[in-house]
Amino acid sequence: MGAKQELWEYFMNHTTGRRSLKGAVHGIIAFTMDVDEEITDLILKRLKRSEITFVESSGAYFDFLRKQLHFPYKISPAHRTTALHEMGHAVDFISCERIEKRVNAHSTRTIFKEHYTTGEYVLSSGKTLDKTVREELKANGARIYSELLSRFNREVLDKLGSDVAENYLTVNARLVSDDTAKRKYRVPYQTIASYRENRAKIDAMYALRDSMTLTYDERYNLFESRKTVTKSTEYSQFCDRYDTLIDMISGVENTKYLWPGHSRSYMKRKGGFGVEFFADVFSSTATRNASDLEFVAELLPNSYAGFKEVYDHIKAIA
């Protein structure tokens, strides 16, 4: 059984109802820093009920959680666990990097063995434990997975089901196939956005891509770099309209959706079109090309929660 199959079985065996985390799960879930509000809500509900042990993989994400938990001050790594426990949360915050440092330091090895020798481990960002420590954990009944859900291919996500994918897929995911060299299913993403928006955007992109008559290489480049010069009229027209939209977006200033440094080239490289990038454009669309707005509307399905209002607004303007 491969690592992905094992992880799939793990989530299937430890989920119930809407396939959300079961309270009895004894394990460590490590996320990357770019986790959206929807996933955070899922986590917080369980943190407040002291149901799970949660390990974060970056200080930046903890700061984001700290705001969600309404901590009045910034908590240093050394005080995170204590502070959360005082608030009644059964949570241990420690990054994969610190796990490795701790288990390889003789002075702290005992601490690790006391608290992290059993359970389920999902390591993020490709981090791996020291081989000796890994063997110790396995000897104590631990199951260790180093496969990220964000590295799952599209077929596996479909098998997992939308609820599971929605709950566990990190927002900075780039869906790729097993053969990463081919990058068969790579799609663009935003640095921060909700998974629902990403999912809808992904579906729209696949639908648009699949509706075109393109070669394999053209399909690969369509939403990645778009640097390949093709003979496809449909593809060229799409690129022209996409450039127009990016120009429109790049003129928006002081918007919470555009981080510093989100230049036109950056947004093109990251595939920067989605509801979040258009939300603040609508107030100044009087001079915009109506066909471009219709093009946006075509890319945003109105069947997704949160999209209907935006979709209708685009249609009204167009």
Go through the PLM ranges and name each one.
Residues M1-G2, E6-S20, G27:
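Fold-level signature of zinc-dependent metallopeptidase catalytic domains
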Residues K4-M12, M33, E38-A318:
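Active-site-flanking segments in enzyme catalytic domains
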Residues R18-L21, V25, I29-D41:
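Generic structural signal for alpha-helix starts
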